[in-house]
Regions:
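Hydrophobic alpha-helical connector segments
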Residues: 77-108, 146, 154-161, 190
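Helix-turn-helix
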Residues: 17, 21, 25-59, 63
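C-terminal peripheral helix-coil segments that are non-catalytic and often amphipathic
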Residues: 1-2, 98, 102, 130, ...
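Amphipathic alpha-helical linker/stalk segments
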Residues: 2, 62-91, 133, 139
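A contiguous binding-surface segment within folded domains or other stable secondary-structure elements
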Residues: 111-141
Length: 203
């Protein structure tokens, strides 16, 4: 599709329909398990029509991953050096849990990519993502060194937030099966995680 002209309303809608359909397919089957024919069928479009918007399966997958990373990393970027350290970190935890609840397919897509060695995201993870984490880790380390939060390894603190929030999306079937239908995993996880991190960070 030509990129030097603004999209019409119909083109914008069709592009969104394709990405939504592809997200569902990739999150369920991974990159290797999905074909352009399958995405086109899920989107309700012909394959030639789909190829008007995206040149390949890889292009669709890359567009999804790019959108996901922007969404996923925004809360980490928003840590405010001028804010209260414990409040900033707890807000980050809440935002990450909310993203897992509102975007479970995106979380599973990212997990699937990483579990396969991040063949398409490797340079981004080793570059911009690693740099952002290093910057935020330096901020958290500074807070700890100033005695504003308890001493913690900042990288592993960030990893723990990823693990403890994204688990509820990536392993949703397991969580719901173990807890049973009477439980709301996200409503219960929120207070638990807040207590956990308050205790971890308290000085």
């Amino acid at each position: 599709m030509p990129h030097d002209q603004p999209l019409s309303r119909i083109q914008t809608r069709n592009r969104r329909v394709i990405l939504d359909a592809a997200l569902e397919e990739f999150a369920a089957a991974g990159f290797a398990g999905v074909t352009l024919d399958r995405i086109a069928a899920a989107a309700g479009l012909s394959k030639p029509n789909l190829l008007y918007y995206f040149a390949s399966k890889e292009a669709i997958y890359t567009a999804l991953l790019d959108d996901l990373l922007d969404l996923w990393l925004a809360p980490l970027r928003e840590l405010d050096p001028a804010g209260d350290p414990q409040a900033e970190i707890l807000t980050y935890v809440r935002k990450k849990l909310a993203l897992s609840q509102s975007h479970p397919r995106e979380s599973r897509l990212f997990a699937n990519e990483v579990l396969h060695g991040a063949p398409r995201l490797g340079p981004v993870i080793a570059g911009p993502l690693a740099q952002l984490v290093a910057d935020r880790a330096a901020l958290i380390r500074g807070w700890a060194q100033a005695g504003r939060i308890a001493p913690v390894d900042p990288h592993h603190l960030i990893f723990s937030v990823w693990a403890l929030t994204q688990h509820y999306a990536d392993f949703e079937a397991q969580v719901r099966a173990v807890l049973g239908p009477a439980h709301d995993p996200y409503a219960e996880a929120g207070p638990f995680l807040e207590t956990l991190y308050r205790r971890l960070l308290a000085v």
